[in-house]
C-alpha cells in the first residue's frame, strides 16, 4: 500500500526472501558486492516462492541517515476551488525553507490542510478557497546513499520504481484505521535504530528516529560476556528474557557457551543476560517515552503501542513495555 495514498487496494504477499545482510550497517552500504549478492539471493528466494519474476520493485529504507522535517506550505487558489493539482503544488511548496544540500526528498506526507479560515482539513479537494495551506512531514535521505542503493538494484537487473521510508510502511502494514483514529504509536525496533510514528484522528502526528536498535543489545552482550558478536546474537535470540531479572525469586541457570560455539569453554548466567538486555531495552523505551512527552501523549494513547521490527521479537518485551510506557502494548502483524 502507498502510505501517501491509503485508498489504494491492499496487496497480497506472493513470495518472501530472507538472507543475512552482510554489506549494510546502520542503513548504509559498506560493501557493494556483498549488498548485491544479498539482493540477488533474497530476490531469487522470493521469485521461486511466487513462481514469477519481479523486474520492478518498490523498496523501503531505514537507518539514521533518513531525516524528518516538519514544515508549512501556502499557495493562492486562482480558480477558487481546490484541485488535486493545487494539493500537489502546496506540498511542493512545503519544501521551501528546508536545506536540501546533498539530500533527496523521499516522500512528503500531509499532516493537515487549512482552507482559508478552516483548519485541520484532511482532504481539501473540491472545497471553495482562495488560499490553501499545509502542514507536512518531509522525509529526506543523503543523495549518495540513495544513489548507491539504486545502483545495487540496477546491477542485479532490478528497476526501483519507488522508495519509501520504513517509518511510513511499517505502520501501514500493521495498524488499523480505528487505531489511527483513536491514537496509537508504532514502534519499529530495527537493528541500528528505532522508528517512532504517532497517529491520531487518522493522520500522522509525529515521526522520529531513535539511533538505538537491536544490534546495540547484541554488542552489550558481546562486551559483557566477552564473546563474539555471532555468539552474542545467538544468546540474545535463544536465551534472553527481558523480565527474568524482575522475578521475585528467579530460577537462575548457567548457560554453557559451548552450546553455541564449541570453542567456548565458559558459562553465563541467564540472570546476567537478562540484566544486560533489559538495561538497553529500557533505554530504548525511555527514549520513546521522551518523544511521546514532547507531544503530551505519554501514557495518553488509547490504542497504545504496537511493536514491529526484528528487535520486537525479544522474549517478554510486551510486559516490559507496558510497565515502562504505561500504555497497552502489542506485537503488530500485517
At which residue positions do the language-model features occur?
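Nucleotide/phosphate-binding catalytic cleft detector across ATP-hydrolyzing
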Residues: 2-186, 203-205, 214, 228-276, ...
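Residue-level signature of catalytic and energy-coupling elements of molecular machines
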Residues: 59, 153, 188, 221, ...
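Generic beta-strand/beta-sheet core signal
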Residues: 60-62, 166, 187-190, 197-199, ...
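Short glycine/serine/threonine-rich phosphate/pyrophosphate-binding segments
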Residues: 171-172, 192-197, 314-315
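Glycine-rich phosphate-binding loop of actin/hexokinase-like ATP-binding domains
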Residues: 182-224
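Short beta-alpha connecting loops at secondary-structure transitions
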Residues: 205-206, 219, 269-273, 302-303, ...
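Feature representing long, continuous alpha-helical segments
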Residues: 219, 271, 275, 279-286, ...
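Nucleotide-binding motor/catalytic cores of P-loop/tubulin-like NTPases across gene-expression machines
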Residues: 299, 303, 307-334
Amino acid at each position: 500500500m502507498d502510505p501517501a495514498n491509503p485508498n489504494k487496494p491492499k496487496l497480497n504477499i506472493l513470495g518472501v526472501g530472507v538472507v543475512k545482510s552482510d554489506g549494510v550497517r546502520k542503513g548504509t552500504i559498506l560493501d557493494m558486492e556483498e549488498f548485491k549478492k544479498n539482493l540477488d539471493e533474497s530476490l531469487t528466494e522470493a521469485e521461486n516462492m511466487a513462481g514469477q519474476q519481479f523486474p520492478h520493485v518498490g523498496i523501503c529504507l531505514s537507518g539514521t541517515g533518513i531525516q524528518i522535517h516538519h514544515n508549512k506550505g501556502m499557495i493562492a487558489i486562482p480558480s477558487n476551488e481546490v484541485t488535486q493539482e493545487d494539493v500537489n503544488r502546496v506540498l511542493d511548496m512545503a519544501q521551501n525553507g528546508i536545506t536540501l544540500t546533498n539530500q533527496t526528498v523521499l516522500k512528503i506526507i500531509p499532516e493537515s490542510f487549512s482552507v482559508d479560515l478552516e483548519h485541520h482539513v484532511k482532504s481539501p479537494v473540491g472545497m471553495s478557497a482562495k488560499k490553501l495551506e499545509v502542514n507536512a512531514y518531509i522525509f529526506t535521505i543523503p543523495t549518495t546513499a540513495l544513489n548507491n542503493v539504486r545502483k545495487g538494484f540496477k546491477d542485479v537487473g532490478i528497476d526501483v520504481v519507488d522508495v519509501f521510508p520504513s517509518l511510513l510502511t511499517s505502520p501501514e502494514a500493521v495498524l488499523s484505521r480505528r487505531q489511527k483514529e483513536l491514537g496509537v504509536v508504532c514502534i519499529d525496533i530495527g537493528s541500528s535504530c528505532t522508528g517512532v510514528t504517532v497517529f491520531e484522528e487518522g493522520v500522522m502526528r509525529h515521526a522520529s528516529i531513535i539511533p538505538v536498535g537491536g544490534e546495540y543489545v547484541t554488542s552489550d552482550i558481546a562486551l559483557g560476556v566477552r564473546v563474539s558478536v555471532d555468539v552474542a546474537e545467538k544468546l540474545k535470540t535463544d536465551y534472553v528474557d527481558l523480565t527474568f531479572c524482575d522475578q521475585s525469586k528467579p530460577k537462575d541457570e548457567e548457560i554453557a557457551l559451548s552450546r553455541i560455539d564449541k570453542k567456548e569453554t565458559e558459562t553465563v548466567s541467564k540472570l546476567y543476560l537478562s540484566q544486560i538486555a533489559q538495561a538497553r531495552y529500557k533505554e530504548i523505551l525511555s527514549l520513546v517515552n521522551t518523544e511521546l512527552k514532547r507531544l503530551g501523549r505519554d501514557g495518553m494513547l488509547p490504542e497504545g503501542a504496537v511493536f514491529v521490527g526484528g528487535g520486537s521479537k525479544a522474549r517478554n518485551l510486551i510486559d516490559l513495555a507496558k510497565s515502562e510506557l504505561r500504555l497497552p502494548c502489542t506485537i503488530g502483524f500485517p
